[in-house]
Structures are given as C-alpha cells and as structure tokens.
C-alpha cells in the first residue's frame, strides 16, 4: 500500500472532511490538488498547535450556544402556548395548512427572538385545535411547544 501523508484542511471538502480536520491522503492528491489550491496545509508542530487552539475555541463556542439554547427552551416552556390565526371554512377546516414559517412567526412575535423555520417540525395541521410542535434549538437541544390554531 502506498504511503499516505497527513494534512490539515483549510476548508470543507465534501468527500474528505471539514475545515480543521486532520486527514490522511495520497501524496499525489496533496501535492497536486490540496496544497497548490490552498485547500490544506502539511502537518507541522505549529499547525497542530493552531488546530488544537481552534478546536478548543470551537468547543467553547458550542458550549455557549448550547447554554443559550437551553435558556431559550426554558423561555419557550415559560410562555407555554403559541397561537397561529388562520382562515377557516366550515367545520373548522383551514384554508391551506399551518407551515413552519407560521410557527416561526408566532415564536418570534412572542419571544422577539428569531428561529429558523427549517428547525421546526410541524405535523400536518388542517383543522383548528391544539398541536405539539418540535423546535430544534441546537444539535443537542430540542423544545416541544404547544401550538393553538384558531380561526380569524
């Protein structure tokens, strides 16, 4: 088997790894593609020290983000119920459906904090009533909120 060389990636490469990862690659791949285009740097003690420093800062940043997410989940639990107003027809059937964007707007209006609509999991809602909605606040923190759909 051919000798492999270690490099530290300067950017995310789909088939290889993320920025700051230490990866083993073929010497030709490193020499002909990664190094000349600035996508990676060869491993040296100074580079390893920078990588460790970057990882420590990233771990600290992630811990702070997680604490903020837990605090926001507590705020969502304190509020308890969020209301979305939709137009209805007969028998409390909605014209359309409740979307992630509708829920994000309801959360934003109540908390004054923006939530990405892609992080909200809404069940199929076609009638007025109460529903449970999942909100992903962090990779390790999710909140379940009560959503009240009412007619206007």
Swiss-Prot record:
UniProt xrefs under Pfam families: Ribosomal_L9_C, Ribosomal_L9_N
InterPro entries the UniProt entry points to: Ribosomal_bL9, Ribosomal_bL9/RNase_H1_N, Ribosomal_bL9_bac/chp, Ribosomal_bL9_C, Ribosomal_bL9_C_sf, Ribosomal_bL9_N, Ribosomal_bL9_N_sf
GO BP: translation
GO molecular function, one term: rRNA binding
Keywords from the UniProt entry: Ribonucleoprotein, Ribosomal protein, RNA-binding, rRNA-binding
UniProt KW Ribosomal protein keyword: yes
GO cellular component: ribonucleoprotein complex; ribosome
Annotated function: Binds to the 23S rRNA.
Family according to the record: Belongs to the bacterial ribosomal protein bL9 family.
Protein name per its UniProtKB record: Large ribosomal subunit protein bL9
Protein's organism: Synechococcus sp. (strain CC9311)
Lineage of the organism: Bacteria, Bacillati, Cyanobacteriota, Cyanophyceae, Synechococcales
